[in-house]
């Protein structure tokens, strides 16, 4: 009979129903090592669904806003940012560009723009005092020359949409904040920008989740983005101004912590529809910029916690090497056996995750497939940053220790007549 014949053949082949029931169980068990690479999806979902946005903020006007732009050798970008600020729908405002002793045409361009619009003023920078880093010093000079009830510190390599300032002031008031900072859209144009920048920005986004920043009860959980910091003058003065962070490499992070210690409220929002910036334009600039900031900024993110500060190098290794485990395991196993299956699954999950990140950053999604290269490069930058930062950072004639405090001037070789090239991330 057909039924019995069928039954016999199944039994004879050794594929009993009991044996078949074990196959998927074994497969699922073998894939369990890949589960850690599902966790980032949960973090990404949380980040996407708890992201305060300037789009929700009301439009505001009224108080004079002093927009302060520290600039050193920014001739290629200064006109763009100035014109974008002047196109703001917010009224009233004044715009002060602090020329930090530029050797290019920055001052000339600003003078031309000032002749076109009376709201623009050029503030010639004074010599850098001992114990000060460039950007805090430029910001303080801009503050001293300003008249506004509100102060906006923004970078020269940013571009503002017309509603950015009005919505930012609206959010500052609606949230009752003493410091408003935003995350702009990060423009990634070249190959290395698109491969490496997502790795670093994800680490920052997970470390400083906006929901955590906005309800922070601990100093370690607050941050500010130096590309855009809006503060009432009264709150800024009460927190000690940028003078309180004059010797800090990560002056924006240190300023947020200073505000928190002073009992001030910080609000962080996404502004990807209203502001954009491009930090680096080459692999060399990217490596140099993050090498200076990554380790020292990581240590600064755990103020008064020496044990966690000491663990920063390990945190950087774990943060980037996490993504290298699946592809390395896949290469070693050739995809064979249980470990190979788990490695293949983990690699696939990681690739999907980074493709989603690329889409979120408006990068072609296929760059997500290159995540092992990005993670490896970021890991190398982290190692380089640790090596340099743990010893001494030399930048524009001064030395900085791991605490970020100036260790004094460096002797300059007589043959050196030019300053190092301007780094997009670095203070001017």
Annotate each language-model stretch with its function.
Residues 17-61, 197-198, 206-210, 378:
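N-terminal membrane-anchoring/stem segments of glycan-assembly enzymes
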Residues 24-27, 59, 308, 312-390:
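Membrane-embedded multi-pass helical conduit in multi-pass membrane proteins
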Residues 37-40, 48, 121-144, 167-239, ...:
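Long helical/loop segments within the catalytic core of UDP-sugar-dependent glycosyltransferases
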Residues 47-55, 74-87:
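Short, well-formed alpha-helical segments that are part of the catalytic scaffolds
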Residues 63-66, 94, 254:
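Cell-envelope/extracellular polymer assembly enzymes that use nucleotide-activated donors
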Residues 82-129:
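Acidic donor-binding segment of Leloir-type glycosyltransferases
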Residues 105, 154-171:
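Acidic donor-binding/catalytic loop of UDP-sugar-dependent glycosyltransferases
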Residues 172, 179-205, 234-237, 242-306, ...:
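Catalytic donor/gating beta->alpha subdomain of glycosyltransferases that bind UDP-sugars
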């Amino acid at each position: 009979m057909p039924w019995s014949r069928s039954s016999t053949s199944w039994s004879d082949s050794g594929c009993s129903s009991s044996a078949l029931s074990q196959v998927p169980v074994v497969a699922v068990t073998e894939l369990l090592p890949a589960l850690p690479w599902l966790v980032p999806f949960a973090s990404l979902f949380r980040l996407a669904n708890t992201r305060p946005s300037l789009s929700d903020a009301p439009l505001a006007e009224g108080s004079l806003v002093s927009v302060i732009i520290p600039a050193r050798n920014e001739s290629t970008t200064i006109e763009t940012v100035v014109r974008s600020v002047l196109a703001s729908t917010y009224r009233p405002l004044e715009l002060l560009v602090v020329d930090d002793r530029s050797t290019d045409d920055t001052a000339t361009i600003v003078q031309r723009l000032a002749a076109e619009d009376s709201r623009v003023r050029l503030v010639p920078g004074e010599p850098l005092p001992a114990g000060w880093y460039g950007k805090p010093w430029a910001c303080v000079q801009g503050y001293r020359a300003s008249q506004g009830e509100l102060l906006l510190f923004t970078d020269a390599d940013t571009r503002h949409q017309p509603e950015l300032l009005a919505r930012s002031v609206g959010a500052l008031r609606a949230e009752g904040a003493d410091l408003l900072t935003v995350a702009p859209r990060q423009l990634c144009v070249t190959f290395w920008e698109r491969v490496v920048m997502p790795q670093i920005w994800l680490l920052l986004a997970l470390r400083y989740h906006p929901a955590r920043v906005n309800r922070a009860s601990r100093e370690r959980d607050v941050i500010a983005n130096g590309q855009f910091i809006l503060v009432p003058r009264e709150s800024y003065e009460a927190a000690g101004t940028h003078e309180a962070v004059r010797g800090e490499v990560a002056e924006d992070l240190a300023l947020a912590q200073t505000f928190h210690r002073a009992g001030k409220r910080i609000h962080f929002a996404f502004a990807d529809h209203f502001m954009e910036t491009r930090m680096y334009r080459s692999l060399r600039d990217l490596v140099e910029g993050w090498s200076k900031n990554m380790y020292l900024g990581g240590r600064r993110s755990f103020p008064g916690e020496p044990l966690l500060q000491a663990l920063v190098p390990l945190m950087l290794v774990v943060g980037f090497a996490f993504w290298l485990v699946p592809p390395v395991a896949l290469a070693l196993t050739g995809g064979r056996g249980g470990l190979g299956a788990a490695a293949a699954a983990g690699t696939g999950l990681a690739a999907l995750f980074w493709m989603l990140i690329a889409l979120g950053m408006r990068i072609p999604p296929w760059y997500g497939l290159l995540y092992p290269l990005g993670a490896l490069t970021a890991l190398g930058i982290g190692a380089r940053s640790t090596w340099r930062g743990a010893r001494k950072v030399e930048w524009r004639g001064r030395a900085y220790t791991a605490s970020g405090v100036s260790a004094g001037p460096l002797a300059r070789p007589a043959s050196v007549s030019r300053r190092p090239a301007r780094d997009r991330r670095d203070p001017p």
